[in-house]
Amino acid sequence: FNTFIVMRKISFVLAAIMAIALNCNAQSSNGCYRGFIDAGYSIGVGDYEFGRFEVNTSHGYQFNPYLFLGAGAGLHFMSSYETKDMDIPLDVRDSQVDIPVFANIRCNFSKKKVSPFVDVKGGTYVTNNGGLYVNASAGCRFAINEKQAVSLAVGYASEKLEFETFDRFTSNTSMNYTRSPRKLDTEAITLK
């Protein structure tokens, strides 16, 4: 159990370092292609307290210095999960990689070297029987030069993920049971 806590803390620190290093984008002031690569860590809140490392990329059109519209995909790496403090876990999920595809809109509030922004991604997972993916975040963009910037953001994600859920005991006289796949709503705070 202590190893799990240590690994979780190490994963969080590595994700934070990667987010700062990888959250770069190719930028131009208006009327052209723009691409983003962001890496970060999601901290599960609510009923499902799991964490995961994620990498997303978005590509689209920068209409003006303030508005970007595009589409993207990601890789979200989730370790195995079991409902805590139960002899027979209610919900379980094996370690897996979820792949979301999404539309992305991003609004910058300034043309200066340091600019606050909001970013919204909405789509679906194409792996593990699909499910809704929505992530809204707010942050600050720090321009490195005319074509590159580093961004830091905090956000909220709402996702519908598939878990194996306790279904029923197989008889009245044994502890054998069955599980059924079920999509459940999950929430997370994202750091990118």
What kind of feature is each model-predicted range?
Residues 43-52, 95-97, 123-133:
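Solvent-exposed loop/turn segments connecting transmembrane beta-strands
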Residues 1-33:
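Bacterial Sec-dependent N-terminal signal peptides
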Residues 47-112:
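Glycine- and aromatic-enriched membrane insertion/assembly motifs of diderm outer-membrane
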Residues 42-45, 87-92, 122-126, 139, ...:
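Extracellular loop and loop/strand-boundary signature of outer-membrane beta-barrel proteins
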Residues 41-45, 75-79, 107-111, 122-128, ...:
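Transmembrane beta-strands of outer-membrane beta-barrel pores
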Residues 102-105, 183-192:
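Outer-membrane beta-barrel "beta-signal"
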Residues 34-40, 72-74, 117-121, 153-155:
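Transmembrane beta-strands of outer-membrane beta-barrel proteins
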Residues 66-69, 112-116, 142, 146-150:
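Repeated loop/turn-to-beta-strand initiation elements of outer-membrane beta-barrel proteins
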